[in-house]
Amino acid sequence: MRIALDAMGSDNAPSAEIEGIALALDELKDLEVVLVGKPGIVDSETMDGYSGRLELVPAAEVVGMNESPYEVVKRKRNSSMAVCMELLKQGKVSGVVSAGNTGAVMAFALTTLGVVPGVHRPALGALFPTIKGSTLVVDIGANVDTKPLQLLQFGIMGTTAASYLFKKANPSVGLLNIGHEDSKGNELTFNAYQLFKQSEMNFVGNVEGNAILKGTVDVVVCDGFVGNALLKYAEGLAEVLSGLLEQYLEPDSEHRTRRWRRWLSKPVLREFIERMDYQEHGGSLMLGVLGAVVVAHGRSTPRAIKNALRSAATAAQDNLSEHIRHRFAETAPTT
């Protein structure tokens, strides 16, 4: 599987990307990476060390985190982000990963790859760890203002992706709300509930925030404003838990009692905290565009980049965008 990586995207670019590639190529033997960025960012020894599995494609321009997506699409057609999308469009790679400006990644994907026919707005889907495995949450930041039909489409895209990611024939979906009763919520969620209820999806109804960590449903749908706040909270929770664990295990910690140390040292606790870490999931799937695109976190570490490359390879291998296209061609409402 051949994936293009935007070398200039993250806050720590290009070092995080280059180190992440090394981790990915060492672990994923079927992976090939096309690194897109400024010439000379990778030395010849590193290139030669991966026997043709690593290629550098030059791109002179860089998209900044604070730049307007609309402006960069017009002005920076030779940016690393734009070149990645062009490689995917031309079929030279099977997927794209970028830890850059999310709005710009979305804009380049829309203008270069195009949108699945019938999809009003593409959405970002992120895997949240649960006590049962994972839940796919859609949308986590692409659309802060949405309409009921768009939420329904998020559900259709999310359940289609989940059926392949989770290997389930009929994944369940819930609408994130402040209560499980069908009368709860605001005008958006109330009207969306009616659409979900009439759909052919395995709709379980409204779900509250605690349903995500419990793994009550396979897919949770919300608007991007709520979803992004939820994502940042989950990331913060993982960081706090990890920090507390290290603090309590310090040899001179006042909290370090034998009982605490025994409990905190349990492998199951460490495993849970690691699963909560955003680095383990790498990035978010862009659902609704014609291609496999993963948006990684701006502060991605090498481990996060490695896992984002894995996610993109999986999405490409499962052909998620094509399955979503078929689903919308067959059953999805567009008006």
Map each language-model feature to its residues:
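N-terminal charge/polar-biased segments
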Residues: 1-5, 11-15, 29-32, 49, ...
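Short, glycine-rich nucleotide/cofactor-binding loops
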Residues: 5-15, 142-152, 295-302
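Short beta-strand segments
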Residues: 6, 35-36, 57, 98-100, ...
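Glycine-rich phosphate/diphosphate-binding loop of Rossmann-like nucleotide-binding domains
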Residues: 13-16, 28, 32-40, 144-209, ...
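N-terminal glycine-rich anion-binding loop in soluble enzyme alpha/beta folds
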Residues: 13-67
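Phosphate/nucleotide-donor binding subsite
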Residues: 49-93
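Glycine-rich phosphate/nucleotide-binding loop
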Residues: 110-123, 127-137, 216-220, 224-335
